[in-house]
Amino acid sequence: MEITTTLIIIIFTAIVSFTAFSNEKIMNDLIFYPPAVQRGQWYRFFTCGLLHADMGHLAFNMITLYFFGGGVEQNFSILFGKYGKLIYLAMYVLALAFCLLPTYGKNKDNYHYRSLGASGAVSAVVFSSI
């Protein structure tokens, strides 16, 4: 089995999610929380994609990424040559943040709002495969 960028994303996301399932501090430090972003914690636009609400949420996102990501990654390598994997990774990471911009605008003062999951980035990969 080849170690692909997609597989690395899946493994890293699973490790962080499993760790956060049993560690509330990690969950609170990485989750997307708009008031914390307003205090300069911009990393939360990205780190929330490493967290999932439960095993089903994690499994659905990572299985979907596995089935669609490999093809997109391969096509990016064909289209962009040696930069294909880097562009694929950049698309995934930037999609994490981009999909949260409307949410941030709507909830920037909402102290009760939190968000997590990689669904926005996984959706970007799925749409890229079309």
Where are these regions (language model features)?
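A detector for small-residue-rich transmembrane helices and their helix-helix packing motifs
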Residues: 1-130
